[in-house]
């Protein structure tokens, strides 16, 4: 997957994506190794769609609580595509995650999403605001008010 040849990298990401889709929960032991590599490959524009699809397939294998550090690293990635796609993945994950799990991980994710909402890249900003909106939809206005008050109007 760390090959410099685009075709080789793209094929390996598609293979991993299909493995995740097929194995579902059985792929969980390998997720912590996979996520940072996929996020790193997001820096290449030609691989962006395949990497995002690979991350989306992870929703069936792992909880966002288990990959908290990896997702936070993706939200801090130096490439805007990494930040954007990670925030979009997080938005989808928020909608399908049990509320008790979200309650445990929300402070970590929300602090970083508020920072990303002030990003210079408009796509990253929009993705972070989408994830914040998903959190607001799950938790309500009263819980989110302390985080949303930090945003610039």
Where are these regions (language model features)?
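HEAT/HEAT-like alpha-solenoid repeats
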Residues: 1, 26-42, 64-77, 102-116, ...
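Hydrophobic residues within the alpha-helices of tandem HEAT/HEAT-like
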Residues: 1, 12-23, 38-41, 53-62, ...
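Short inter-helical turns and helix N-cap capping residues of alpha-solenoid HEAT/ARM repeat scaffolds
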Residues: 4-6, 43-46, 78-80, 120-121
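Amphipathic alpha-helical interaction segments
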Residues: 4-8, 19-30, 45
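N-terminal alpha-helical segment
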Residues: 12, 31-34, 51, 67-68, ...
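Short, structured loop/turn "capping" segments at alpha-beta junctions
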Residues: 47, 61-69, 81-83
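Short acidic, glycine/proline-enriched loop segments that cap or flank alpha-helices
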Residues: 78-81, 96-104, 119-123
């Amino acid at each position: 997957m760390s090959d410099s040849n685009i075709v080789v990298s793209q094929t390996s990401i598609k293979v991993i994506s299909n493995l995740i889709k097929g194995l579902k929960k059985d792929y969980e032991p390998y997720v912590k190794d996979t996520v940072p590599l996929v996020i790193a490959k997001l820096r290449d524009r030609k691989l962006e769609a395949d990497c995002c699809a690979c991350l989306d397939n992870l929703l069936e294998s792992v909880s966002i609580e288990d990959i908290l550090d990896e997702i936070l690293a993706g939200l801090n990635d130096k490439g805007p595509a990494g930040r954007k796609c990670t925030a979009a993945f997080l938005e989808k994950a928020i909608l399908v995650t049990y509320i008790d799990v979200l309650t445990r991980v929300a402070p970590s994710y929300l602090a970083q999403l508020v920072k990303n909402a002030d990003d210079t890249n408009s796509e990253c900003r929009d993705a972070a605001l989408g994830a914040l909106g998903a959190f607001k939809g799950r938790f309500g206005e009263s819980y989110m008010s302390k985080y949303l008050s930090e945003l610039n109007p």
